[in-house]
C-alpha cells in the first residue's frame, strides 16, 4: 500500500492526505493504526466531545484505536460530506481486539486529490448549536452538512 498517499497541508483543516497517483475505485490505501484502548479508557483519557479534535477511531462496541499514540498517516485523513474513501472494518472471527480498519477508495481518485471519508461522529447527547460548532465541517462541497456529527435522532431532539 506504500506510495499511494502523501501528507501535506489541507485547505479543509491542518494536515490532509492526498492521492500520490491516480487510484482506481476499491484501492486499499492504508490501515488506521494506533494504541488499542477500551472505550472506558478513552472516556477517562479524553474529553473529545468538547474539543472538536480527536484521532480516536471506534473499532467496535469495546475497543478504540487511539491514533494519538502510535498512529500513522491515516489519522490525517479529513472528514468530507461527499467522501471519496471509506473505512472498512476487517473483523477478527474470535478476538474483537484484533479487528482492523482499512481505508479504501469509494470511487476513482485523481492524483493530488484530497482523500476524505465521512467520520459519522455520534454522541449520546443532544446535538446543540455549540456542539455542532465544535464539530463543524469545512469540506466545502456542495453537499456539505456543516457538521461532522452523524445525523439522527439526537440532532432532531436538539431542535
Predicted regions and their residues:
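Catalytic core of the SET domain in histone-lysine N-methyltransferases
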Residues: 1-10, 50-128, 138-143, 147
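Short cysteine/histidine-rich zinc-coordinating motifs and their immediately flanking basic loops
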Residues: 149-157
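Conserved AWS/pre-SET-to-SET junction and N-terminal core of the SET lysine methyltransferase domain
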Residues: 1-50, 84-100, 155-156
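Short, Lys/Arg- and Gly-enriched loop/turn segments at beta-strand edges
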Residues: 36-42, 123-133
Amino acid at each position: 500500500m506504500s506510495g499511494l498517499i502523501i501528507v501535506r497541508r489541507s485547505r479543509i483543516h491542518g494536515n490532509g492526505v492526498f492521492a500520490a497517483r491516480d487510484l482506481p475505485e476499491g484501492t486499499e490505501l492504508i490501515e488506521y493504526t494506533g494504541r488499542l484502548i477500551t472505550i472506558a479508557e478513552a472516556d477517562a483519557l479524553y474529553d473529545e466531545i468538547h474539543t472538536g479534535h480527536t484521532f480516536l477511531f471506534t473499532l467496535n462496541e469495546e475497543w478504540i484505536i487511539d491514533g494519538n499514540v502510535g498512529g500513522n498517516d491515516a489519522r490525517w485523513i479529513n472528514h468530507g460530506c461527499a467522501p471519496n474513501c471509506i473505512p472498512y472494518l476487517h473483523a477478527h472471527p474470535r478476538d474483537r481486539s484484533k479487528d482492523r480498519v482499512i481505508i479504501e477508495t469509494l470511487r476513482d481518485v485523481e492524483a493530488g486529490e484530497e482523500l476524505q471519508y465521512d467520520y459519522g461522529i455520534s454522541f449520546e447527547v443532544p446535538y446543540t448549536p455549540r456542539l455542532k460548532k465544535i464539530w463543524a465541517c469545512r469540506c466545502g462541497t456542495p453537499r456539505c452538512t456543516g457538521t461532522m456529527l452523524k445525523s439522527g435522532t439526537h440532532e432532531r431532539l436538539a431542535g
